[in-house]
Amino acid sequence: MIDGVTGDPGSCSQLGGALRSHTVRLLALREELVDRAERLRRDGGADDVVADLDASLRLLDTVAERLDASGTALQRFAQELAEIAESVRRLNELVRAAGLELNGLRVVEPWGVLTTELAQQRHRAQPDLQRRADRLASRLGRARIATARVMADGTAALAAAATASRTRSLR
């Protein structure tokens, strides 16, 4: 379910799964690089090539680790989004039953003429419903922050690995 409040859990999950699939493919290639490096070490005389392969392995390890961490974070985020979206749907039912509207994650009174009784009903229900909406907004914010942190850490780790790789290739 896609909505303007929480986002699209399906797309997040799909991207997370794709990143984790790429990790598996990279790790399969890693075995080939390890075998080549070991053969060259045994045969001797190719120290520069072995050093380059070792550097490539370190880069590959970093990329695979960060892809897997990012994919895992996105899939966790997708699960959280789906749960929050369902909670928002249930909250919306309660809000409507109280004669109110949910605008994003704000519980508001709709426009129109109303009776004193309905106004009092809305006035009594609104604070509790807004607290529920606020808890959902807080949960959504925490999930977004946790996911963004993993992505930022991954970006920094990949940038450092790329710099180290470029430095090695310039020697």
Locations of regions flagged by a protein language model:
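N-terminal secretion-targeting helices of virulence/extracellular proteins
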Residues: M1-R171
